[in-house]
Regions:
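C-terminal capping/gating helix-and-loop segments adjacent to ligand/active sites or protein-protein/ligand interfaces
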Residues: 72, 310, 349-422
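Conserved N-terminal structural module of periplasmic/extracytoplasmic solute-binding proteins
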Residues: 6, 21-103, 121, 166, ...
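Extracytoplasmic/periplasmic substrate-recognition and gating elements
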Residues: 287-350
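Hinge/lid segment of periplasmic solute-binding proteins
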Residues: 99-151, 165, 174, 200-201, ...
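Glycine-centered hinge/linker elements that transmit conformational signals in sensory
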Residues: 222-256
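Extracytoplasmic/periplasmic solute-binding protein
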Residues: 141-145, 174-227, 272
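A structural signal for short loop-to-beta-strand junctions that line the ligand-binding cleft
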Residues: 85, 93-94, 122-157, 186-191, ...
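Feature captures C-terminal
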Residues: 447, 451-622
């Protein structure tokens, strides 16, 4: 831990992410026959969750720990700018979480957030690390959880089968790629259709440059707003390294189009030997089943130049609203402390795949991440530079490079700086919403905002029925003007996928029953705010002390025909939730290539100039 403390004290450059979780709801309907009626009014706390990972065991942990709280969980867009959108409508959640984080972006929220600088919670962090979250006036609004590690995942078993040496530096990494290409196996692939991959690989292959004295000096200037341009001294070598990486590995237009799952599926089939991934990916995609996989660093010119790339799993903050009440202030701080204490971080680092940032937290590493230990001791963990514009522009420029639209490092640097100097896209007004809908859940009407979105998706998709977790609609639907960017904030997009399939009525019963009963899953229901919304059919559900039970499904008041077949759209998490319910329904394939929620909202408001479909009373909660 002393070595780890040294590591934490060295991380003065932190700028990263956030996440959230939830809890149990209180007065949400008549209790079931076997349940205890709830007469005591609970304190409502709204928690904005950065991703559906929080719907796993983490939200249930908070529900169990604070039974006196009526938690409302929403899946927020993973951006500090989302909270700017909420602040514009005077509708900030009580507890905020975000993974994509930079002080450069977060400073715009400073006046809306609670100052944590003098709290016991802030005192549990190493002082030098806390400096990274401290403004010039001493204010601290955000605190990090544990660190996600993001580097190269390799299939050691595949290396052994083909007698390819495990890489130790950049030259041996390239040699390994060439050896696998010679036998028809991709040496290295990655999901360059994702902005985070473009940004992380661009930075990852040049960490020694970015960690140099010149690199750290430039980053301080950028984070403070003193410059909005990439330094040629620092960044031209970065682009030179990426061009070399691209050319020697053989990356091109096909790689630019790879979505998140493609490299992982190839890795699972033994079709590629290495890909960019996280500690969580080591658990979820362990090669061909029995393969030994390792999380390796970004390789430098020498072994001493190797680094791992990291970022906080998420940051937490609290809204100012209501914090002038001492009792509520204490409750919010107690919840935040539980989110980042040992027990809370154990629920985040469920697979022993993360590194703690706090003095009072110890997290074990799984064997696949043993390589990381000496890098922790040597303080060789780089924290990615993760401002909103870094994500956006890194993707734009890396895609240009992979598609041969820019052919030299100088052109790439110029293209990046041109984008930095330009206006952010998507900020002009493109739509007007006429009618306000609340996303508060009531047992009589459900979540009306989520119902309006689900009904609109059903109409535009042409499918018979739609089923989606209501918390994917992240806030009230406010009446007024919207930019394209703000339209996207209505519904969670990066974690939600449309699953298109044909289901019998009997399979739909299985789907709903499985969904209500599942635990430890990114589609799990932990309270009323995380229940699902249905479009085209209604659900009769009983709430008990142990959860939720399905009584009946109806269409227009008549029982759903179990023998009939319906075109069906599930909107939710793809890899964990959909795979589990599909197995229960006996379905092996699902089409997830359709539009996401933002696409349907754009079609409705921008392309058609329309409005949302009216909500329906889709649930009876007993």
């Amino acid at each position: 831990m002393k070595r780890l403390a040294c590591f934490l004290l060295s991380l003065v450059m932190a700028a990263t992410m956030l996440t959230g979780c939830g809890g149990q709801s209180a007065n949400s309907g008549t209790a079931g026959e076997n349940s205890t009626p709830q007469t005591e009014k609970k304190e409502k706390v709204v928690v904005a969750c950065w991703g559906n990972q929080m719907l796993d065991s983490y939200t249930q942990y908070l529900c169990d720990l604070f039974p006196e709280v009526e938690f409302e969980f929403i899946l927020a867009t993973n951006s500090t700018d989302y909270y700017r959108f909420r602040a514009d409508h005077d509708d900030m959640p009580d507890i905020l979480t975000v993974r994509r984080f930079a002080l450069k972006d977060a400073v715009l929220l400073k006046d809306f957030l609670y100052d944590l600088s003098n709290t016991e919670l802030a005192g549990t962090y190493y002082g030098s690390y806390l400096d990274s979250y401290t403004y010039d006036d001493g204010t601290v609004n955000w605190l990090p959880t544990c660190a996600e590690v993001d580097s190269f995942i390799i299939n050691k078993t595949l290396f052994d089968e083909y007698n390819v040496p495990i890489p130790t530096d950049y030259e041996s990494f390239i040699a390994a790629c060439e050896a696998f290409e010679a036998v028809g196996i991709r040496g290295y692939v990655s999901d360059f259709a994702a902005d985070y991959t473009c940004m992380e690989v661009l930075q990852g292959v040049s960490i020694p440059v970015l960690q140099s004295i010149e690199g750290r000096k430039w980053r301080q200037q950028y984070e403070s707003g003193a410059t909005n341009q990439l330094s040629e001294e620092v960044w031209l070598p970065v682009f030179e390294n990426f061009f070399d990486f691209k050319e020697k590995i053989g990356l091109g237009a096909e790689d630019a189009a790879y979505p998140n799952r493609t490299p992982k599926d190839m890795f699972s089939e033994g079709e590629d030997a290495m890909y960019r991934g996280t500690g969580a990916d080591v658990i979820t995609f362990p090669g061909r089943g029995q393969d030994e996989v390792l999380l390796m660093p970004y390789f430098g010119q020498t072994e001493q130049d190797n680094w791992y790339l990291t970022y906080p799993t998420f940051q937490i903050a609290a809204s100012n609203k209501g914090m002038d009440d001492p009792e509520r202030e204490k409750l919010i701080l107690d919840i935040m402390s539980a989110m980042v204490n040992q027990q809370g971080q154990d629920h985040i680092s469920y697979g022993k795949n993360m590194v703690p940032y706090k003095k009072d937290v110890t997290l074990e590493l799984m064997p696949e991440m043993d390589n990381l230990k000496p890098y922790i001791e040597e303080n060789k963990l780089y924290i990615r530079l993760a401002s909103n514009e870094m994500f956006r522009i890194s993707k734009a420029v890396v895609q240009m490079i992979l598609n041969d639209e820019v052919t030299t490092p100088q052109e790439a640097l110029a293209a990046f700086n041109k984008e930095l100097a330009g206006e952010e896209p998507g900020t002009e007004i493109v739509a007007h919403i006429d009618t306000y809908y609340s996303n508060d859940f009531t047992p009589e009407h459900g979540n009306q905002a989520a119902s309006a979105v689900a009904n609109t998706i059903r109409k535009l998709s042409g499918y018979d029925l739609v089923f989606m977790q209501a918390c994917y609609v992240a806030n009230d639907i406010y009446a007024g003007d919207y930019s394209q960017k703000d339209l996207a904030y209505i519904a969670k997009n990066d974690g939600g996928w449309p699953g298109l399939m044909e289901l019998t009525g009997d399979q739909i019963y299985t789907l709903v029953e499985t969904t209500l009963s599942m635990t430890g899953n990114r589609g799990a229901v932990c309270n009323d705010s995380t229940l699902y919304v249905s479009s085209g059919f209604e659900m009769d559900i009983t709430k008990t002390d142990s959860g939720y039970t399905l009584n009946a499904l109806t269409m227009g008041g008549k029982e759903l025909d179990r023998s009939a077949t319906y075109s069906f759209l599930i909107y939710g998490e793809r890899d964990w939730y959909m795979s589990e319910v599909m197995e229960k329904m006996g379905i092996s394939e699902v089409d997830t290539t359709g539009p996401k929620a933002e696409g349907y909202l754009t079609q409705c408001f921008v392309e058609q100039g329309g409005q949302l479909e009216a909500p329906t009373d889709y649930i009876i909660l007993r």
